[in-house]
Regions:
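Active-site nucleotide/adenylate-binding loops and adjacent lid/helix of ATP-dependent enzymes
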Residues: 13-18, 125, 130, 152-163, ...
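Short acidic loop-to-beta-strand element that houses the catalytic metal-binding Asp/Glu
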Residues: 37-41, 150-156
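Flexible, glycine-rich loop/tail regions that form catalytic "lids" or insertion modules at the edges
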Residues: 301-313, 317
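Conserved catalytic alpha/beta cores of large enzymes that bind or transform nucleotide phosphates
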Residues: 58-130, 194-198, 209, 213-215, ...
Length: 320
């Protein structure tokens, strides 16, 4: 709200991730984002950069935990010699974070992890984290918003009231009443229950505004303006394609640029200039010109690599 008050509101109000139903909602601890998954890269200059921020549905932590477990088995001496900070407590810390937003008076809140289902690419992580925290893994069809406005999970013993939902479903698919009306993975009435504090949702609906890559471009300025500090880790230079000068620079140096949709994640919709044919370049420029707010551009970065076993040999693979 401070950012909107002090600067042009259009950056927020025109974002694909802006949700009007979040306006005036008051949350416990006044905290909207409880989990942040920023993508870090190591560039050719040897420095680390933040490539993008993920606050809507951050994913990937289970792979970090599994990787650390394997590394400790294979190279235990490295962890002993260099005092590497342990990460084993992550599931416990995550559970404590979820429990802290409980709006009920229960000392042992009922917490569930809401997954899109077995066909989601991150389903392994959903089941892993639910198991590690000792909470139920549920799909939308397992939950119901009753007449009293509270959320319940269906069990063989009957309905059990849910206090906190760790959602791994995008905003638009959480509730057919407030997003995609055809969603089959959400829960009808869930957003209203959240607005009325009858259930807590982590991360809160509306956090996608912080995922917006056009908003990302302003994060260093936000840090300097509001915290009076310099960012510890720098952002990648980002060109806003609503700006005519930025557009001209990007189009004139297309081969050195990466074009990204502001609301996508996981590499979806990205165009790498050097890999484009003439027709692909022209098609990308047309898309940008039709909706400049929907795209940003960044210079192509040479990412660090790690040896990866491909089935026959070790090959370099880029890291982020």
């Amino acid at each position: 709200q401070m950012c909107i008050r002090d600067r042009d509101k259009s950056l927020i109000l025109d974002s694909p991730a802006y949700k009007k139903y979040c306006v005036d909602v008051k949350l416990k601890h006044n905290t909207w984002s409880h989990i942040c998954g920023s993508d870090l890269i190591k560039a050719h200059d040897g420095k680390f950069y933040v490539l993008e921020d993920n606050l809507r549905v951050p994913s990937g932590v289970s792979y970090m935990l599994e990787n650390r477990m394997i590394m400790k088995r294979v190279f235990p001496e490295l962890f002993y010699q260099y005092g590497v900070t342990p990460i084993d407590a992550y599931p416990t810390k995550l559970y404590e974070t979820l429990a802290s937003v409980n709006n009920s008076r229960s000392k042992k809140p009922e917490i569930v992890l809401l997954t899109p289902g077995v066909f989601n690419s991150a389903y392994y992580e959903h089941s892993f984290l639910a198991q590690q925290m000792g909470i139920d893994l549920v799909e939308g069809r397992d939950l119901i918003v009753a007449k009293d406005g509270f959320v319940y999970k269906k069990t063989i013993e009957g309905l059990v009231k849910v206090d906190v939902i760790y959602r791994r479903i995008d905003d638009d698919y959480l509730d057919p009443d407030q997003g995609n009306p055809k969603t089959t993975i959400g829960v009808k009435g869930l957003i209203r229950a959240w607005q009325e504090k009858k259930v807590a949702i982590v991360n809160s609906p509306g956090c996608g505004i912080a995922d917006d890559k056009a908003v990302y471009a302003y994060v260093p300025k936000m840090i300097r303006f509001y915290l009076k500090e310099e960012p510890i880790i720098r952002n990648i230079k980002t060109f806003l394609l609503t700006n005519k000068d930025h557009r001209n620079l990007v189009f004139n140096n297309f081969k050195e640029m990466v074009i990204k949709p502001v609301a996508e994640s996981g590499g979806y919709g990205i165009v790498i200039g050097k890999n484009c044919s003439r027709s692909e370049k022209d098609a990308t420029i047309r898309k940008v010109m039709n909706n400049p707010r929907n795209y940003v551009a960044q210079p192509l970065i040479s990412l660090s690599t790690t040896p990866t076993y491909s089935g026959e040999s070790l090959e370099p693979r880029h890291l982020d």
